[in-house]
Amino acid sequence: MRAVIQRVKKASVKVNGELISQISQGLLIFLGISKKDKEEDIKILADKIADLRIFSDENGKMNLSIKEVNGDILVVSQFTLFADCRRGKRPDFTDAADKEKALDYYKKFVAYLKNKSEKVEEGIFQAYMEVELINDGPVTIILDTEDLKKPRRRKE
């Protein structure tokens, strides 16, 4: 699983011009699911995001998690996070999970996050969405469960 996480002042999703969901201060998460992903990846990624200290404390240091600031979360499915652009001019999406697996894991990821955080909103799976956001910072973090499962590198 791969997530592009953006700290936002606010974000919203529209489909066909209709407002589907919106959040105030919090995290906008673009979520991609690959063929290789396992059920355990849902918990690994959701736990990491819920505890990630990327909000500023009273000293301006990134030291607080989404839970500690009572922030909102907006999750948007995005299979294009698994685009392979190594050859040719058109991205190849064969590493992305098929729609049945992707929908299942997406729903489970959102449900798991809802157990960790007060307010979790979502886009519409497989819909063409207009996503609006106001970045806060900007702070953008990319997480991939393939990397999260590897041992930590030693500092040199």
Swiss-Prot record:
<comment type="subunit">
    <text>Homodimer.</text>
</comment>
<dbReference type="InterPro" id="IPR023509">
    <property type="entry name" value="DTD-like_sf"/>
</dbReference>
<dbReference type="GO" id="GO:0043908">
    <property type="term" value="F:Ser(Gly)-tRNA(Ala) hydrolase activity"/>
</dbReference>
<comment type="similarity">
    <text>Belongs to the DTD family.</text>
</comment>
<protein>
    <recommendedName>
        <fullName>D-aminoacyl-tRNA deacylase</fullName>
        <ecNumber>3.1.1.96</ecNumber>
    </recommendedName>
</protein>
<dbReference type="GO" id="GO:0005737">
    <property type="term" value="C:cytoplasm"/>
</dbReference>
<dbReference type="GO" id="GO:0000049">
    <property type="term" value="F:tRNA binding"/>
</dbReference>
<dbReference type="GO" id="GO:0006399">
    <property type="term" value="P:tRNA metabolic process"/>
</dbReference>
<keyword id="KW-0963">Cytoplasm</keyword>
<dbReference type="GO" id="GO:0051500">
    <property type="term" value="F:D-tyrosyl-tRNA(Tyr) deacylase activity"/>
</dbReference>
<comment type="function">
    <text>An aminoacyl-tRNA editing enzyme that deacylates mischarged D-aminoacyl-tRNAs. Also deacylates mischarged glycyl-tRNA(Ala), protecting cells against glycine mischarging by AlaRS. Acts via tRNA-based rather than protein-based catalysis; rejects L-amino acids rather than detecting D-amino acids in the active site. By recycling D-aminoacyl-tRNA to D-amino acids and free tRNA molecules, this enzyme counteracts the toxicity associated with the formation of D-aminoacyl-tRNA entities in vivo and helps enforce protein L-homochirality.</text>
</comment>
<keyword id="KW-0820">tRNA-binding</keyword>
<dbReference type="InterPro" id="IPR003732">
    <property type="entry name" value="Daa-tRNA_deacyls_DTD"/>
</dbReference>
<keyword id="KW-0378">Hydrolase</keyword>
<feature type="short sequence motif" description="Gly-cisPro motif, important for rejection of L-amino acids">
    <location>
        <begin position="137"/>
        <end position="138"/>
    </location>
</feature>
<dbReference type="GO" id="GO:0106026">
    <property type="term" value="F:Gly-tRNA(Ala) deacylase activity"/>
</dbReference>
<keyword id="KW-0694">RNA-binding</keyword>
<dbReference type="Pfam" id="PF02580">
    <property type="entry name" value="Tyr_Deacylase"/>
</dbReference>
<dbReference type="GO" id="GO:0019478">
    <property type="term" value="P:D-amino acid catabolic process"/>
</dbReference>
